[in-house]
A protein has these predicted regions:
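Structural preference for beta-rich elements and adjacent junctions enriched in aromatics
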Residues: 1-182
Length: 182
């Protein structure tokens, strides 16, 4: 059950992001964009701890960029193959809904950037992205890309992602006025 409240965000447009490496994009967004607090936590009955989490968001001519910032108890990144159950690890999730579409897009990432991604009309019937589709998603993880077992203690990490408009069926030259996300 989610405890989030709808909030409208305006994404800033930065065409130069497409010519920067992902670490530089992360630094740019940190300096130029407002951080938005993530107050939603899934699986409350299974996990009683809520990490501090925030994100920045912007777009370019080709991508939607989201930089997640997380600080929490323990850190885990065991899953390292596409569409593996990254929700078992330290992870973040991003949903997108395109106007006039019955489907929504679900992107789950663990702290090393492993992705479990799909599009679907309902939770029960996902169409998983292929390895070729997932390869189009740019990722930069402050934890690196090597899997590791759970590390105890307080840890901070960030994950910078870039999702191509073409992957989610949008024409970057004719974007809709509104894209829903959470």
């Amino acid at each position: 059950m989610s405890n989030s409240i709808a909030k409208q965000l305006k994404m800033s447009y930065y065409p130069q992001l497409d010519n920067m490496d992902m670490a530089d994009v992360s630094n740019f967004l940190e300096l130029n964009e407002e951080k938005h607090h993530i107050g939603c936590r899934n699986w409350v009955d299974k996990y009683n701890f809520q990490p501090l989490a925030a994100f920045t968001i912007a777009y370019s001519d080709k991508y939607i960029y989201v930089d997640f910032y997380v600080r929490g108890n323990n850190l885990r990144a065991v899953n390292h193959t596409n569409n593996s159950p990254v929700a078992e690890d330290s992870c973040v999730e991003f949903f997108l809904s395109i106007p006039e579409s019955k489907e929504y897009w679900n992107f789950e990432f663990n702290c090393i950037g492993t992705v479990n991604a799909s599009h679907r009309e309902t939770r029960e019937n996902p169409t998983r992205l292929t390895d070729c589709e997932i390869a189009q998603i740019k990722r930069f993880a402050s934890c690196g890309a090597t899997p590791f077992e759970e590390k105890e203690g307080i840890h901070s990490w960030n994950l910078m992602i870039a999702i191509p408009f073409s992957l989610i069926g949008l024409d970057a030259t004719n974007l809709p006025e509104l894209i829903k996300g959470n």
